[in-house]
């Protein structure tokens, strides 16, 4: 029986993948740096902290990690605050899970302020008891850390917890 649900945000809850398609490229070009053709693949599973470190080490970006993250978040900020939409029929599904007592949280690479803004605007934030970000757990989604922390927070057992 389903007791817990750990949700990804971009492309699962929100139709928001396109917002991130060229953030890295746009950021580097704004800095006067031409990105390599495989940049999107290189940073796809990285947290913002990991991507910032990669840009500093690989491209010689002069901003600090925090400055770089702030610049990247600013590129997508308006999209999350004013445009990002829920995937079709998701609101009804979340309501159904909530009504049956399924505990839910989010595990995402997106910064918390953007997650909260979009979900509050879409009126689904209250369905989730916590938001775990790669930045807050200190690891990208290519590692199990974020999912383990989410599972521990929910207090549900693995066989009865679904990752969406």
Language model features with spans:
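A structure-centric signal for secondary-structure junctions around beta-strands
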Residues: 1-2, 158
């Amino acid at each position: 029986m389903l007791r817990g649900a750990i949700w990804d945000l971009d492309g699962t809850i929100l139709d928001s993948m396109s917002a991130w398609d060229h953030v890295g490229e746009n950021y580097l070009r704004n800095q006067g740096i031409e990105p390599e053709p495989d940049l999107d693949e290189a940073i796809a599973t990285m947290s913002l902290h990991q991507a910032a470190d990669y840009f500093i080490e690989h491209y010689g970006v002069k901003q600090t990690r925090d400055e770089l993250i702030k610049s990247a978040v600013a590129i997508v900020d308006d999209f999350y605050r004013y445009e990002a939409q829920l995937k079709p029929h998701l609101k009804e599904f979340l309501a159904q899970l909530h009504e049956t007592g399924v505990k839910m949280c989010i595990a995402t690479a997106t910064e918390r302020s953007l997650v909260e803004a979009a979900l509050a605007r879409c009126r689904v934030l209250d369905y989730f008891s916590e938001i775990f970000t790669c930045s807050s757990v200190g690891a990208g989604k290519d590692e199990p850390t974020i999912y383990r922390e989410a599972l521990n927070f929910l207090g549900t057992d693995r066989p009865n917890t679904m990752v969406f």
